[in-house]
């Protein structure tokens, strides 16, 4: 990837190269390419201004990711059993427009709602779409050109990861996603995720990089 980026003559060229050669989403239309490149252009414009820092030097991109992770971690321990998860649901429901016009109930499954609520709290809804359903959220990521299904990809802190618990482990995991979380840390072949609705609470889980249950 780095070699491809170094030879690119523009943000658009670099974005298109990564999209077509590495991410390879089903939808590689011009609309998707333009939208994907616009995110890179935004950061390029920001970090090439005088006095700005690059993401690798601790600029806003890395700060946004860490803030997203830290915000999620601050809710660890919230549970459905004592009603403390209601504040998470409320954050989601107070954001407009509601995805598909649906107001989440306190008794609904709330893993995608949790991720969405953290994005709302951090002001990241332009790059992390809000949804209360995992499958629908994946569709929105695909529409934004942000969906990553490359087995060689190593998760980064702040990434949103989806699982299909019913996958057999034979072939690529393409089943319906059951759950979603936020990547907190990576250590060798494993990574730690913060999840909402993990046994009806916000908690941490350790996953294997490119494990059979990873949907994307």
Question: For each predicted feature, which ranges?
Answer:
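N-terminal capping segments
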Residues: 53-124
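Sec-exported extracytoplasmic/periplasmic mature domains
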Residues: 1, 19-24, 45-49, 73-81, ...
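Non-catalytic cell-wall polysaccharide-engagement segments
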Residues: 2-65, 211-216
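Residues within well-formed alpha-helices
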Residues: 13-14, 35, 39, 71, ...
């Amino acid at each position: 990837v780095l070699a491809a980026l170094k030879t690119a003559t523009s943000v658009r060229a670099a974005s298109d190269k990564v999209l077509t050669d590495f991410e390879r989403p089903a939808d590689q239309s011009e609309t998707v390419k333009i939208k994907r490149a616009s995110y890179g252009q935004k950061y390029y414009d920001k970090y090439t201004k005088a006095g700005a820092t690059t993401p690798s030097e601790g600029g806003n991109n890395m700060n946004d990711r860490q803030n997203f992770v830290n915000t999620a971690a601050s809710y660890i321990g919230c549970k459905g059993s004592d009603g403390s998860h209601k504040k998470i649901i409320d954050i989601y429901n107070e954001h407009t427009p509601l995805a598909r016009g649906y107001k989440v109930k306190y008794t609904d499954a709330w893993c995608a709602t949790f991720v969405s609520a953290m994005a709302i709290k951090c002001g990241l809804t332009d790059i992390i779409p809000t949804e209360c359903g995992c499958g629908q959220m994946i569709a929105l990521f695909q529409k934004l050109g942000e969906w990553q299904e490359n087995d060689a990809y190593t998760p980064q802190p702040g990434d949103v990861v989806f699982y299909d618990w019913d996958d057999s482990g034979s072939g690529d995991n393409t089943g319906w996603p059951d759950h979603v979380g936020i990547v907190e840390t990576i250590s060798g072949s494993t990574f730690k995720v913060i999840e909402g609705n993990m046994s009806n609470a916000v908690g941490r889980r350790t996953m294997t990089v490119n494990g059979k249950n990873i949907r994307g």
